[in-house]
Amino acid sequence: MVFVWLTAFFLVVALIVLVIYQLMCLADLEFDYINPFDSSSRINKVVIPEFVLQAALSVLFLLSGHWAMFLLSAPMVYYNYTLYQRRQHLVDVTEIFNHLGREKKRRLFKIVGLIILLFLSLFWMIWTVLLEEDE
């Protein structure tokens, strides 16, 4: 059971790193350190891996029977799926300045949700280690 929590912890850390990378690219664009083409291509390269990691995390929670954690991570997967279906998951080079605020808010909300998942995963990992140590 510790393996599940350890895997979840590393998946959440990887997701946080990907979203922070996207936020850094948007901040660099906002302060004019990078051009729109480079910024959007860098962000678009990590969007699909982020979606796949988030789905893998939810499947891990589902298959391991951690329903509460699955229910906490499922809305983010659904949100990612809806973005993908509407073809709004990629950043458009020509519209990136118009949607800069919205894109930053979207990623900040993701960071908040992922940090909550990170702390919960860390808590349950420690709890599981302590329970297995008593047995």
UniProtKB/Swiss-Prot annotation:
Q: Establish whether keyword Transmembrane is in the entry.
A: yes
Read off the InterPro entries from this record.
Answer: Cornichon (IPR003377)
The answer to whether the entry has keyword Membrane is yes
Keywords per UniProt:
Endoplasmic reticulum, Golgi apparatus, Membrane, Transmembrane, Transmembrane helix
Q: Which SMART domains match?
A: Cornichon
Quote the Pfam families the UniProt record gives.
Cornichon
Annotated Gene Ontology cellular components are: endoplasmic reticulum membrane; Golgi membrane
Stretches that traverse the bilayer: 2-22, 51-71, 111-131
Could you tell me the membrane topology recorded for this protein? Multi-pass membrane protein
Q: Which GO-annotated molecular functions does the record name? A: cargo receptor activity; signaling receptor binding
Which GO terms fall under biological process for this protein? vesicle-mediated transport
Superkingdom of the source species: Eukaryota
**Localization per Swiss-Prot or TrEMBL:** Endoplasmic reticulum membrane; Golgi apparatus membrane
| Subunit annotation | Interacts with HKT1;3.
What is the similarity comment for this entry? Belongs to the cornichon family.
Functional summary from the UniProt entry: Acts as a cargo receptor necessary for the transportation of the cation transporter HKT1;3 and possibly other secretory proteins from the endoplasmic reticulum (ER) in COPII-coated vesicles targeted to the Golgi apparatus.
> What protein am I looking at?
Protein cornichon homolog 1
Instruction: Give the originating organism.
Output: Oryza sativa subsp. japonica (Rice)
Whichever gene encodes this chain, its name is: CNIH1
